[in-house]
Amino acid sequence: MNTTATTVSRGRRPPRTLYRGDPGMWSWVCHRISGATIFFFLFVHVLDAAMLRVSPQTYNAVLATYKTPIVGLMEYGLVAAVLFHALNGIRVILIDFWSEGPRYQRLMLWIIGSVFLLLMVPAGVVVGIHMWEHFR
């Protein structure tokens, strides 16, 4: 029996690694999810725009269905996905191309998280104002 199996069998958890809940792993997962979300939005957006050529009446009907509170919340989610994807993309570029990037990757993750939260608050206010004006 090796020492890792012995350590786990005694109830102690092995050290946290990249694949066991490290913040960098969650950043990677969220980056993939935000990228897929943005791709899905762009796909639907292109289909909607193409609908204008087919039938302007159908296009207007589809746009009317987008004027609901749930779509307003989805817009806020889209802002969050684009903002996180952009900020984390900058962090990934710095890690890959800056010689000191790997050393500061955890600090950069916390900075990205802070900037994300600081920008999402005013974005939430703006989206909330638009929703309030639109749905009252």
Curated annotation (Swiss-Prot):
Cofactor: heme
Membrane topology: Multi-pass membrane protein
Positions bound to heme: 85
Lineage: Bacteria, Bacillati, Actinomycetota, Actinomycetes, Mycobacteriales
Designated name of the protein: Succinate dehydrogenase 2 membrane subunit SdhC
KW Metal-binding (keyword) present: yes
SUPFAM superfamilies for this protein: Fumarate reductase respiratory complex transmembrane subunits
Knocked-out gene: effects: Cells lacking the sdh2 operon (sdhCDAB) display a stationary phase exit defect after 60 days in culture. They show only slight difference in intracellular succinate and malate concentrations during aerobic growth or hypoxia when compared to wild-type. The mutant strain is more susceptible to proton motive force (PMF) inhibition than the parental strain, and it was impossible to recover colonies from mutant cultures after 21 days. Cells harboring a deletion of sdh2 consume oxygen at a reduced rate and are able to modulate respiration as dissolved oxygen (DO) is depleted to about 6%.
Gene: sdhC
